[in-house]
Design a protein with these regions (language model features):
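Short amphipathic coiled-coil heptad-repeat segments
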Residues: 1-15, 199-233, 412-430
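Non-catalytic DNA-recognition/assembly elements of restriction-modification systems
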Residues: 8-34, 227-250
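Hydrophobic, ordered structural segments
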Residues: 186-206
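Short, charge-patterned binding micro-sites
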Residues: 222, 238, 330
Length: 430
């Protein structure tokens, strides 16, 4: 048994060397079409069309024609495409992309209608030999196959691979159809589990978004649409300036910024998540002297003052700082540190109030700048909001804190599955 022709991880009872052929010898190229998105619709038609974009956006390696949403060709006639219809087991490549996803492929599964492929950047193939369902789709998305494409890519900003070069790549597969089946089913089950976890995460994200709208009063109302049990009465209209102050960050000297990781981390708007919240990445490391009153503490509440995105995705939004062992977080410029002037406003309640759509809309509309948007402490403090009694504030903060814990757990579970898939994509193919 040749080690180079066998995967590192293998199902029991299989020990034969894998077969290999060039893609050009193993596949027949299929006809392509030059239809654009303008020729398609999602409502009705006789023929469905798989486009370049349908390949790049799909995480899974198999396109399930029963469940994936594929558009129709507007006014498409069967007689015009009858020799081009796809079959189960056909594969489609995206031959260009702005990153190394060029060469991403999907396998067609569960064909229940008339499907064709179109687009200048798609290449469709049909295997000349019968392979087990799901095997090809996952093999073609493995590192074992994709590393062959790296030396064949052309271009600088936009990468591409030609049909001629694609034909030179080597396809490897077990001689045993049973082994092919077990590999294909294993990855297909992983993809289905990932899809279910993504759906669950999306549902929780949508629930939080809906509750942020319904558990805070609408403009002109003194009570929210949805209220926690045991609370009643009107909320009091007030400005944030009646409860809090906001301190600007320090302009740390760029001469002491470090490309080498240190324990001193300057926070930037890049550490804020879209919608609000903290992310421990994109730190700027620092190795200079630090003013003591610009060292941040666990559970400090900060807001962003600057945003570079077109939609001002994080402008004015909050983050509560976690404890990051071995790191000291520094209060950098372009961030505001919130302090509480009295005991009338709960920090948890304020954290989620600053994530509401009405607050963010106010901040964006009052922002200055074109390419770079800016807000200020005064503008944030001038925000007019409705505030309930302190006990209800705490209860609302706890409700959303539990939702966020659920979101973090679901994100971790999803990432674990994706990491597992990536690990086995490297170890179960050659």
């Amino acid at each position: 048994m040749e080690k180079s022709k066998c995967p590192e991880v293998r199902f029991k009872h299989f020990n034969e060397s894998w077969n290999q052929q060039t893609l050009g010898d193993m596949f027949l190229p299929l006809s392509n079409n030059t239809l654009s998105r303008a020729d398609l619709n999602y409502d009705n038609g006789q023929i469905k069309n798989i486009h370049y974009g349908d390949i790049l956006v799909k995480y899974a390696a198999v396109l399930d024609c029963r469940n994936d949403k594929i558009p129709f060709i507007t006014d498409g006639e069967i007689s015009d495409f009858k020799n081009q219809f796809l079959q189960n087991g056909d594969v489609i490549f995206a031959d260009t992309a702005e990153d190394k996803t060029v060469g991403k492929a999907i396998e067609i599964s569960a064909v229940d209608d008339n499907y064709i492929v179109s687009g200048l950047h798609t290449m469709a193939y049909r295997p000349k030999i019968k392979l087990s369902p799901y095997y090809l789709g996952h093999y073609l998305n493995s590192n074992a196959y994709h590393h062959q494409l790296l030396s064949l890519m052309q271009g600088i900003k936009v990468l591409s691979v030609s049909r001629t070069n694609l034909a030179k790549t080597i396809i490897k597969y077990p001689s045993s159809v049973t082994e092919q089946t077990q590999i294909g089913n294993y990855f297909q089950n992983l993809d289905q589990s990932i899809a279910l976890h993504e759906k669950k995460l999306s549902q929780t994200q949508n629930l939080k978004k809906a509750m942020l709208e319904k558990m805070f009063p609408n403009v002109g109302s003194t009570q929210p649409e949805i209220r926690l049990k045991g609370f009643n009465g009107d909320w009091v209209n007030s400005q944030l300036s009646n409860f809090i102050s906001i301190k600007h960050g320090f302009a740390f000297d760029g001469a002491y910024f470090s490309e080498i990781e240190t324990n001193l981390c300057l926070l930037t708007p890049g550490n804020f998540m879209i919608g609000g919240g903290f992310k421990a990445e994109k730190f700027i490391y620092y190795n200079g002297e630090v003013p003591e009153n610009y060292i941040l503490q666990e559970n400090d509440l900060l807001v962003t003052m600057t945003d570079l995105s077109k939609e001002s995705d994080t402008l004015g939004l909050p983050a509560l700082l976690p404890l990051i062992r071995g790191k000291t977080l520094l209060h950098n410029q372009r961030l505001g540190l919130i302090s509480f002037d009295n005991d009338e406003l709960d920090k948890g309640f304020l954290f989620y109030l600053l994530q509401t759509e009405s607050y963010h809309k106010y901040i964006v509309l009052s922002a200055t700048g074109t390419t770079v948007k800016h807000t200020s402490p005064n503008k944030i403090l001038a925000f007019v909001c409705d505030v309930p009694e302190f006990e209800e504030q705490k209860a609302i903060g706890q409700f959303f804190k539990q939702l966020d814990k659920t979101l973090v757990l679901q994100q971790q579970q999803l990432q674990t599955l994706k990491n597992l898939k990536q690990a086995f994509l490297e170890k179960m193919f050659v």
